Amino acid sequence: MKRILLLSLVFVFSLCACSKQSQQPPEPTAQPIPSPLTLSAEEDALMLCCEENRALLAVGHRNGAQEGPLHNTDYLLRWNYADGTSDKVPIQSQAYITSAVFDKADLLYVDYEAADARIAWSLIRCTEAGKTTLASGQADSYDRVPALFTLDKQPMYLLAEDSGLSVCRVDGSKVSTVLTVPDCTMPGPVTVCSNGTQYAFLAAVNGAAYGTVFICDGSGILRQKELSKPVTTFAITDDYVVCGLGAPDADAFSYEAILIGNGNTTTADSATPMWRLAGSGHSCLYVDGAFAPHIFYPNTQQTDTLTINTDTAAYQNWPTLFFSDGAGGYLAQMDIDNTDYFWHIAA
């Protein structure tokens, strides 16, 4: 009888150990992807958006300006990184493009250029038949240009104006305002992040010492949370909005992870600042102040260093951008000695 009981306990403990082990996130892997670009010393490329198997890059050149738009976009590169094919979409203007999304076979992008000490922006739909301007306006500076994102497979954009913030939906050639947040401004460049079904943005609300994060879905604002410190960057995962906290010149950093479902918030110290945060699935990627990459799991508060480039250790800490691939992984763009390299990261 004692032997049976002992075996039963061993079996139960084994199940518990397996259960705990199964909760450990899988080891992330980084697979290099051949670059679709061959750029001259005067050219530069910026990834704008990414989906499963495809991405969009803006390729342009420095225009010699000392302020305002410093680049002109020459063309967009539609890139299928799964099979390596790509095609160019000429821009044929003096504008600069920093925000874009896919809309099935179409492209939507926001371009801008200097106009009488202000910034003139346009929302463009690009199809096989040509380009159509859907909306336009002016902003006081380039960091007030609208930011595009996708919600429930529908193109959207966040607009900052003197009267407050607006979220607009793009349906074919029609643009409609679906949310207004009055009496607040953007504390930095117009930035929004989406996991496909919810989205988040930061706003400076009257009377708040620091930024307030708004978490929304197609029905409107789900919740808003005033943050306790200045924000480095922020991101959204399937379940959380993660905000890196701390002033750039501070010695102490932390984060707040806000559960989208009920608003419960976890606050903890971070050994490094969280810069260039991006979320996908159940994880976040970011770089620290030395551009060393890290992966963070908000549901367990586990943080690990991330090895991307295994060929040359000295090339680990180079300027890197992360983009969700829409399937729980990421596409990384790394600038090594003014040459762009790409990796797909499975997390």
Show where each model-derived region lies:
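Short beta-strand elements that form the blades of beta-propeller/WD-repeat-like
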Residues: 48-49, 53-69, 105-113, 147-161, ...
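Bacterial signal peptide processing site
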Residues: 19-21
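Repeated scaffold domains used in trafficking and secretory/extracellular systems
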Residues: 42-52, 94-104, 139-152, 184-195, ...
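A short helix->beta-strand "capping" segment at the edge of beta-propeller domains
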Residues: 25-45
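Structural motif
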Residues: 64-77, 115-124, 162-168, 207-214, ...
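Short loop/turn segments that connect beta-strands within beta-propeller blades
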Residues: 80-84, 126-130, 170-173, 216-220, ...
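C-terminal motif of bacterial Sec signal peptides marking the signal peptidase cleavage site
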Residues: 14-17
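A short beta-strand motif characteristic of beta-propeller blades
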Residues: 33-39, 85-91, 131-137, 174-182, ...
